[in-house]
Amino acid sequence: VYAENPPQNEPRSEGGWEPLRWAYERARKSIERLKPDVLLVHSPHWMTQQGHHFLGVENLRGTSVDPIFPNLFRYKFGLDVDIALAEACCAEAQNLGLTAKMMCNPDFRVDYGTITTLLMIRPQWDIPVVGISANNSPYYLTLDEGLEEMDRLGKATRAAIEKTGRRAVLLASNTLCHW
């Protein structure tokens, strides 16, 4: 993954990853023009078995270390969470019958999907965030049930954004090998 990285990860070639890096550069410019109040990150790497969780700690800071390549991928991060919007998203999800809760552990280890997405799209770490977990229940539901669950989560999130008057951009973390 080549974005703004630690020195050992700086790109040294015009190889196959360049189009991906250029796409992130274009996305950054697009987001800059939108001037969002908040970035929402729905990450498949923060898996929850019971319901949908929302980050509920005002400031989360640390170093993310990749468990497979700890000497290559180390990112310092510092994110501020939009607690009011996260709580509104959680409440709206509950109102639509979803199991949802706030994650309020100050020692919570932020998942690498959230951190990497934010690092690549907004390396300044200057826009508040709402982190949303990936509820694993769709793996145990039919396709239609899983899609309906995600549709309700989207509607709840949209309602919360509208009620709070935020300008928001939704970022969906993913990897090229998740199929």
Task: Annotate each predicted stretch with a short phrase.
Residues V1-W179:
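Soluble secreted/lumenal catalytic domains
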